[in-house]
Amino acid sequence: MKNTLKLPLLIGVAGGTSCGKSTIVERIIENLNANAKQSGRQIDIVHLSLHSFYRELSAEEKILAREGKFNFDHPDQINFDLLAETLQNMIDGKTVEIPKYDMITSSMNGTVTVEPAKVIIIEGILLLYDERVRKLLSTKLFVEKNAESRLRNRLATYIRDYHRAPLSIIRQYTEFVKPAFEEFCRPTKKYADVIIPRGADNHVATDLIAKNLQETFRKIVVSSDEEEEKENELVKQGSFRRPFSRPH
């Protein structure tokens, strides 16, 4: 985790396909919101997916994708330039347009406007692959789950949500997903601040991470409030002038 405490907090969650990243993010958000409510503070949280930063496929590639013959897990399929630019703009407090990715048609479908937030959580298999992105993250998490469980979860999800045939899912997993995980995803575990074993089954780790993030958020807010109080006091004394203020 970064030593410098400042908002927004940008949390990255990486790990293999269907290892429980989304479930873990949802639990972290739930815990953060619950803790914030108890302390009487409001916390704005944005949840993003690396899917939004897939590059646009050609017509031929979309056909291959529908047949389970396209490798989505290779780094070349991610627009890391756009991802790094978007995250930097969010850190700078700017409103951004996030592409909307349709998992069924393997295509982009417009954008969604995202306002500035105090906590930004983004998840994706190759999230820790690009150095520029890693440098922007306040906290980097890597979720581990055994290969058999990940394949079982992937089968259930892709059959239920994307209407994919089981044999197509298994073929794509064997030919592309598993080899790409070993070559590109697993090695990025070394960049993680925290490794979460057993995936979404690890409630203890999720709760501890949420508590740590909540405490970090509290310290930032308190520090910011104290700085503002000092600044206001100096302004009253006439020994401090806020940036860009005009002389009276």
UniProtKB/Swiss-Prot annotation:
Domain of life, per lineage: Eukaryota
Residues given in the record as ATP binding sites: 15-23, 201
GO annotation, cellular component aspect: cytoplasm
EC numbers: 2.7.1.48
Transmembrane spans: none
A biological process from GO: CTP salvage
Molecular function GO terms recorded: ATP binding; cytidine kinase activity; uridine kinase activity
Recorded catalytic activity of this chain's protein: uridine + ATP = UMP + ADP + H(+); cytidine + ATP = CMP + ADP + H(+)
Keywords linked to the UniProt accession: ATP-binding, Kinase, Nucleotide-binding, Transferase
Binding site for substrate: 73, 101, 154, 164, 172
Xref: Gene3D superfamilies: P-loop containing nucleotide triphosphate hydrolases (3.40.50.300)
Family annotation (NCBIfam families): PRK05480.1
Family: Belongs to the uridine kinase family.
Protein name as catalogued: Probable uridine-cytidine kinase
Species assigned in the record: Caenorhabditis elegans
Organism lineage string: Eukaryota, Metazoa, Ecdysozoa, Nematoda, Chromadorea
